[in-house]
Amino acid sequence: MREIVHIQAGQCGNQIGGKFWEVISDEHCIDATGTYYGDSDLQLERINVYYNEATGAKYVPRAILVDLEPGTMDSVRSGAFGQIFRPDNFVFGQSGAGNNWAKGHYTEGAELVDSVLDVVRKESEGCDCLQGFQLTHSLGGGTGSGMGTLLISKIREEYPDRIMNTFSVVPSPKVSDTVVEPYNATLSVHQLVENTDETYCIDNEALYDICFRTLKLTTPTYGDLNHLVSATMSGVTTCLRFPGQLNADLRKLAVNMVPFPRLHFFMPGFAPLTSRGSQQYRALTVPELTQQMFDAKNMMAACDPRHGRYLTVAAIFRGRMSMKEVDEQMLNIQNKNSSFFVEWIPNNCKTAVCDIPPRGLKMSATFIGNSTAIQELFKRVSEQFTAMFRRKAFLHWYTGEGMDEMEFTEAESNMNDLVSEYQQYQEATADEEGEFDEDEEGGGDE
């Protein structure tokens, strides 16, 4: 029944992916050995979206773990849920990509990609009716960004009619590992624009700000950032994992959320925000949840939605609450802030409710917005890219792996095109006719 194959690539991808499996295994009452210990039919009704049922009633994640060096995988394997994964599904090299996109995409990663695709085929063949793939990776490193995008394009070739969904961590100078992050990110976005159906932009800058300002953590660690990511990932996949009506599979979500094929970069949000140590002590009301969820401070992408307009929005509420109240609050928000929703897509805000709240909370809300304000994030990366590229700084690391400067120029202009497409639809009104250039849709193909 409608399975999703999960792939995690690179250090960041494996860390947030590992955390994701811990959180959803907990929600579905699957312990670290893959045994079910719960008592609710809701937990098992759609368990096979993410898990294979093996012999002896063991549930095994439909997950493939990929990296160009063994380090992170060893720590996943020795972590709390390390034993739940299928041992054959760990695919790793020894050389590492050294934060170099070209190594991940053209040299080291290209050597490993076939063995990953073998595992992908094996997992897909075990599916009754595969709906698509989800990839967790970062755009700033070498493996997740370079090899991750290579995997996407290879999978796209082989499964052109399946949905490709990514959780992509966008780099930020505030939480930076490497100088060349803007290069890697721009080259990756160039690929994501063409080859994915839905991309959740998780932005280290926003995560850092949430930890620092809202959660009052003075020195946020990657563990703290990943805690937010896993809460968000659990939220946006709720509709896929639990029985429900709205956005119940990846394709339906895409149909609701993506008005133009290239504009599929979503801004996730979450409420209530809690740090790892302290879960909330008082339950929030539905109006508070709704207010918080639309607040710029709760966005996992460092963009202010008030600087743009929403093309589409999906909201997922979790916990026992009155549907009537949820609908009223959502209408209320849209009426009060109507100027921030484009008027040429009526009813562009959809709401789903799931009875099972995340662990430690009475109720929570997850937000998925397709906002034109996401251009701020691409602009930020683009400015950093241009600053270095103008001086051709660090380019020899990439050309040394066989890349051409031309590819950088193309990636740069593709990202700038994306920004201006968002800008164009931000300014569009319902009554103007045919002012859109027709080359929008076709302009993307190389």
UniProtKB/Swiss-Prot annotation:
It is found in: Cytoplasm, Cytoskeleton. Mg(2+) binds at residue 69. Keywords: Cytoplasm, Cytoskeleton, GTP-binding, Magnesium, Metal-binding, Microtubule, Nucleotide-binding. It comes from the Eukaryota. Its cofactor is Mg(2+). Dimer of alpha and beta chains. A typical microtubule is a hollow water-filled tube with an outer diameter of 25 nm and an inner diameter of 15 nM. Alpha-beta heterodimers associate head-to-tail to form protofilaments running lengthwise along the microtubule wall with the beta-tubulin subunit facing the microtubule plus end conferring a structural polarity. Microtubules usually have 13 protofilaments but different protofilament numbers can be found in some organisms and specialized cells. Tubulin is the major constituent of microtubules, a cylinder consisting of laterally associated linear protofilaments composed of alpha- and beta-tubulin heterodimers. Microtubules grow by the addition of GTP-tubulin dimers to the microtubule end, where a stabilizing cap forms. Below the cap, tubulin dimers are in GDP-bound state, owing to GTPase activity of alpha-tubulin. Belongs to the tubulin family. This is Tubulin beta-2 chain. It comes from Drosophila melanogaster (Fruit fly).
